[in-house]
Amino acid sequence: MIDAWYNKSFWLYILAPFTFVFSALAKARRNSYIKNPKKVWDSPKPIIVVGNISMGGTGKTPLVKFIANELTKRGFKPGLVSRGYGGKYSGTLEVTPETTYKQTGDEAQILAKLNVPFFIDKNRSRAARKLQEKHDVDVIISDDGLQHYAMGRDIEIAVIDGARRLGNGLAFPAGPLREPKSRLSEVDFIVNNGGPTEGDEILMTLSPAKFIHLNSGKEYSVDKWPMHNQVHAIAGVGNPNRFFDLLLRLGFEFDKNPFPDHHKYNKRDLYYLDHLPILMTEKDAAKCKHFKNSKIWYLTIE
C-alpha cells in the first residue's frame, strides 16, 4: 500500500469515499480540542513535538536524537516521551538500555541509547507527567505525537521525506496523509529529510556513521568496513529504498530484502546458505539480537 501511495497509483481513487470519512473524523477530533481547551493538558515544562502528517517513514527518530543531543550539549536537561509502537507494556513504562524490544517496540530501543529520561505510553500526556514527576527535566521532546492533541505543545516540528514528499496528496486510506497538507502551514518548522527543499523547509541530511557487529558490538567507521562488499541487505522500515540507496552510494553489492515497517523477524527471514554478511538498519537490529546470528551487522546514521 505504501508503494502505491508514493507511486501515485490510479486505482487508489476507488478508496476516495473512505478517505472523506477519515478526513472528516480527523478534522472533527482536532476541532473538539480547539473548541474545548480544557481537554488539553498543558505541561509546566515546554514540549517539542517532532512528528509528521504522512505515513511511511520520514526520519523523525534521527531528528529526535539530534535535538536531544544538541539540547544536552547546550546545558539543558531533556526528557523523551513516545508511544512505544509495537511494544507489549501496559500503562506507563520508563525505558532504559536494559528494557527489552518486546516491551518497547523497535524505535524506542534506538532512543533508549541517548542516556536521557525516557517514558513510553499510548497516552503521551500521561508519559510526560510521569517523566516530570520522576526526573528533573527542563524540556520534553515527544517522538511523534503531532496528532496527539490531548497534549499541549510549545513547538511543533513536522518532518517530510524530501524525495517522496506527500505522495499522492490524499488522506488515508487512498493516500499516506494523516492530516491535510494545509496542516504544515500551522507548524513552527518543516524539516525536509534529504531534499530538495521548498519554501521555508529546513534541510536535514543524514550521514552514515558506523558499522556495528550485532553479536560482539565491534564498531567500524564507514570507511573501515572489515568485510567484502557483497552483502544481504535487509530493511524493515517505512522507506526501505532510502537504506538501499545509501548502501549503493557506499559501494555495496547486495540483494534487496524489504520488509514492512515494524516487521517482527523470524529465523527464516535471516537464513542464507552462503556466508555473506547481513547488513540492516539500526531499527531492524533492535529486533534481531536474540537470534545470535553472527553474520548480522547494522549501520548507524546521524
Regions found by a protein language model. Name each.
Residues M1-P46:
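A transmembrane-helix-recognition feature enriched in membrane-embedded lipid enzymes
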